[in-house]
Amino acid sequence: MAGNFWQSSHYLQWILDKQDLLKERQKDLKFLSEEEYWKLQIFFTNVIQALGEHLKLRQQVIATATVYFKRFYARYSLKSIDPVLMAPTCVFLASKVEEFGVVSNTRLISAATSVLKTRFSYAFPKEFPYRMNHILECEFYLLELMDCCLIVYHPYRPLLQYVQDMGQEDMLLPLAWRIVNDTYRTDLCLLYPPFMIALACLHVACVVQQKDARQWFAELSVDMEKILEIIRVILKLYEQWKNFDERKEMASILSKMPKPKPPPNSDGEQGTNGSQSSGYSQS
């Protein structure tokens, strides 16, 4: 792993400009409102989380998979490759990169089938339609898009250091850690360095736990305006999440989501590959 975030591909290539991100997203916002797009982000992050938990992966592996997923759709429309295929592909790749060990083909397909059937049947009434050849092809497109820049830095390590420095590990760490997990349901991992996200999550945890840490934050040599920007995104997430009924809303949102054509079928593999290739070639 690159030892210095500031010299890493994560910082040099994958901290994106917000306006560029929104510009790329306009193709999808012809079909979805901004709020519906947010809800899709929350939903597919939940799918990746459920897949990772089913496979008993560490949280860092799940977080890396989520970042890969977001990186792909930061550059390409949802219709380029079906997110239902991209989600397990990201889990498959992240498990290798994070040295968790390769998830076997059988386990991966079994997990995706089981999770969609038991946890998300309200959104996906049909069986998981993909097989390992689709996952491997999708992985190729994902690797090409990311230019093989696979090392991802996360807020977990800096968060642990900050909480220890503050001397409030037992009081603040569990809540701040959960808030970090929740930030992966937003664009924050594409827009800000992980240490800033860690500080913002710690700030929110301090407010919730009524811990006065103003002096500690005042002594940091960090742009507090950016920390406040991140906090606003976190608060917006919780506000939207509170009013989001996945079971009632997702089937309708997914029906509006732009999709690759034609969908895969038992003898239409060429069509699937063609749709992914043509979608991938759009810039």
From Swiss-Prot:
Pfam families: Cyclin_C_2, Cyclin_N. Residues 46-144 form the Cyclin N-terminal domain. Residues 267-283 have a biased composition (Polar residues). Keywords: Activator, Cyclin, Nucleus, Repressor, Transcription, Transcription regulation. Gene3D superfamilies: Cyclin-like. One of its GO terms (biological process) is positive regulation of transcription by RNA polymerase II. InterPro entries: Cyclin-like_dom, Cyclin-like_sf, Cyclin/Ssn8, Cyclin_C_2, Cyclin_N. GO terms for cellular component: mediator complex; nucleus. SUPFAM superfamilies: Cyclin-like. The keyword Transcription regulation applies. Residues 252-283 are annotated as: Disordered. It comes from the Eukaryota. Component of the Mediator complex. The cylin/CDK pair formed by ccnc/cdk8 also associates with the large subunit of RNA polymerase II. Belongs to the cyclin family. Cyclin C subfamily. Component of the Mediator complex, a coactivator involved in regulated gene transcription of nearly all RNA polymerase II-dependent genes. Mediator functions as a bridge to convey information from gene-specific regulatory proteins to the basal RNA polymerase II transcription machinery. Mediator is recruited to promoters by direct interactions with regulatory proteins and serves as a scaffold for the assembly of a functional preinitiation complex with RNA polymerase II and the general transcription factors. This is Cyclin-C.
